[in-house]
Structures are given as structure tokens and as C-alpha cells.
Amino acid sequence: MTGLLVRNLESYSRLAELGFSEKCVLDHSLYTWNDEAIHFWKNQKILRNTVPLELNEKELRHRENAGSEVIVYGRLPLMHSAQCVRKNTTGCNRQEDRLVLKDRYDKEFPVVCYCHPWKTGNTKPEGPCYNIIYNSLPYGLLKEADKVKALGVSAVRLSFTIESAGQTQQILEDFVAAYREGRVSREYEFTKGHFKRGAE
């Protein structure tokens, strides 16, 4: 095991108590927007932090990125919901499934249902379900490889969630070609998130 991806303070606190601070990689959900926050986490002896998704390229150039990794591909969650889409439409069948929500523009938003108690921390036989609703387009910085590398990050991350094995392999190969060889051979429809415009 080379690292543990940590998404909240509670998880970090527990891992630190167990002596795993130096294996912790903070996800983008933990605050590292400025150098003061980065230095705080360095003092905790974490392995790395993740570049905030809300900062744009210009803002990232002014951030200390040497101990950071950046997400260059992934389906980003739009919402975590305790209101199960399946339960509220056709009824819960306790099957972990994928659904699709369509908006008025016919954009499809993948929904993943999580139904098993061990995943929700509930030990009752019928625990609460929850859903993750993902953006209609994956986040991707394929053509921005040179700009990403110029930020001086220590690693790039591809975050696979709902992709098939074949899609995962193809995307991985294309990103390796772009980031190692500077070659983009395939067109994808990606959102760039805040990389170009930033959060307001």
C-alpha cells in the first residue's frame, strides 16, 4: 500500500491516530487552496494533497504545487443524495444499480445506487440507501497536458468510477500518450471544470 485517499477530516483524524499520516493523500474536498493551508498539512506529515478543483489555471500557478497531485480525468459528483432515485420512482430492490437522469436538454446524468449497509456504516439489515449523481460529462484535461505539467505537481490522477474495463484501458492509454509523449490521438467530450474559468 502506497497511500490512502482521504476525503474528510474525520477519516484523516482516525488514520492519524493509527499512525498512517504519512500515507495520507488528501482529496480535493479537504482545504488546500492557499500556501498557509498547504504548510499546515505538511506539518501533519501527509504524503500529498490534491489540487482544488475550484481553482483555475492562473490561480494554480501561484499555488505551491510540489507536494500535490492533480485530477486530470474523472466523473465528478454533482450530488450525494440520501433520497434514493430508484426508491422514489419504481421502488427499492436493494440492488446496487446505475440509473440515468435526463434533463430538459437530453443530457444524461449517471446515478449510482449504494444499498448495502456496510458501505453506509449501518449495521441494520436494511440500512439507508444513498445515490451519487455524476456530471453528464467526465472532467478531463487531456489536451491541457503541457499546462498541467507546468504547474509543478508531483503526480496526476485518473479517477475511474463508472467506466467499463475497456473504457478504462482506452482512457488510460490516451492520457499516458498525452502526458508522457505529448500526443493526443483521440477526441473526447470533456468538461474542464474550473480549470479555465475558476470559481466565483
What are these regions (language model features)?
Residues M1-E200:
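Active-site pocket-lining/capping segments in soluble small-molecule metabolic enzymes
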